[in-house]
Amino acid sequence: MKRTWIKNARIVNEGKIFHGSIVIENEVIAEVLAEETVPSQPCGEIIDAKGYYLMPGVIDDHVHFRDPGLTHKADIHTESTAAAAGGVTSFMDMPNTTPQTTTLEALNAKFADAATKSIVNYSFYFGATNTNADVLPTLDKSRVCGVKLFMGASTGNMLVDRMEVLRKVFANAGMLIAAHCEEQSIISANTTAFKEKYGEDPDIKYHPQIRSAEACAYSSSLAIRLAKENNARLHILHISTAQELDLLEDKPLSEKKITAEACVSHLYFYDKDYETLKGRIKCNPSIKTSEDRNALRKALSTNLIDVIGTDHAPHLLKEKEGGALKAVSGMPMIQFSLVAIMELVCEGILSIEQLVQKMCHAPAELYHIERRGYIRPGYQADLVLVNPDHEWTVTADCVLSKCGWTPMEGQKFHTRVEKTFVNGDLVYSDNKVDQSHRGQELRFKR
């Protein structure tokens, strides 16, 4: 039996910070000990946490690992490597791959592939289309994290735009619907208008005016209405506007059937950053005004925003060239998501307890993940150790995503991920990832 004692830690868990230690027995947390209490049995390995923060591993509910079919940009192995280095111990991957994850055959193939490739834990969304709503009730709710619904066209063109199909999806899903909310008719009209005024590829600075706040608010409002009409479980992804926050309820997660995610990109950048980063920060929905960013940041200290995800979506740098219409949308983010939000903690925008709630606890509760997301005896030992006082600057040579770049290059951070544990195994330490480790399928108790 393998027993590991992580001692001298500042444990951040369930709204509290306390000095203590954790005993890992094989894959699970066996003991959570306060202060100077010693383990009940001898431990073969002892790790001194040096007073650093020890928290549950981050659960990222929103990634695009591009596998299968787009593996020149990324793949499950490379991106799970980046995840481990960033303190992310579990991910949920989106269906806009090639082939799209819109059939049971494609879904099962992704699970089988991840079992051989992924360093961290994993699950996959099933993609709704205009033609597969009848398949949704047959999905294995204990295995599939949710149904992804594109209510706005984005990378992969999986737009569901027929009202009768939308109603059927909300009625038939039987599990969480994760929705990309942008109204396509508004985007199309804006595209036509900006092309007429500025040519075939308007400057990147016009991206947030083409994929506008109005498009987001209209679509999110429609999704909420459909969810309420069908008593469905709706999770609105990547909220990017102050207007959308007005549609949400500020009450505990346990009391809501409609929840919301904010992404690191919309919390970190704003429209002025297009001047320097240009297409590198082009994403859908677009990064908008400083007022929108500030509203999202303020919402982190409330229950309006339930989860912080990444929308990690790698592309090659050459694919990011061009303006508002030719540069592709999406950026890598998973390796630096935790330290980026820790930077907001350092700035007093949210507390570290709130960070752990929105990046660790809430995804586990919201998706009903079995035995993960908390530091509790009997739970899987998915953990991250964070140095709260280490200044460093992101350089290109530290990027582990296959695409080889990050919009965070040149950013100065003041905290650092020191170690990451997945199912009790130390998978990241001393700037190295254990490439031989394999994660597990997430299981859902529904």
Language model feature labels by segment:
Residues 201-222, 226-231, 301-308, 313-389:
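His/Asp/Glu-enriched, well-ordered alpha-helical/loop segment
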Residues 112-128:
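A glycine-rich helix N-cap at a beta->alpha junction
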